[in-house]
Amino acid sequence: KSGNNWYYLDSDGEMAIDTLIEDGDNYYYVDINGVMAANQWVAIENEDAGEDDEPEHYWYYFQANGKALTNGDNDKVSLKTINGKKYAFDEDGKMLFGWVDDDSAERVDDSDGDGFKEGVYYFGGEDDGAMTVGWIQLDITYDEATEDDYKYTAAAFNDDEDQSRWFYFKSNGKKVYAENGDRTKDKTING
């Protein structure tokens, strides 16, 4: 520590700069000046960028103690509130975005455009990540939409696979969908 700032020395005794540091189950980030990030969002380059459904970078939120928020040991989504909005993170501290499965607390692969089928939550785009509540219209690009019998997906699509669809998410962030083999779900919302 120097003044109000914390720094990290690597195994060679050199000050670490512009890097994510893993210390046991905790993750920290030091900036280009070696100062530990605290109470802030940081975008860190994704080494797997360019592969299927992989973003250019991942967002992390570092708390006052410098530790990245994570999902911890939870198997299910554990929501974290930051500046009045709810977010979810994986076990490594990466902010989840897009369609997210409740049971595994992981992003649903949406590279084929069918993430809406398994996704329970929707956390916006890769640079947003805030949990969706209420109505949202999303563009769906799913090549097999008109032939898919999963929960009657085909019944909701016409000849054009590239369509916009409305989804409704309850106050807990979970998607409302038809259950028990029903083709549709009638739900009174706000009235």
Q: Whereabouts are the PLM-identified features?
A:
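Extracellular adhesion/carbohydrate-binding repeat motifs centered on closely spaced tryptophans
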Residues: 1-191
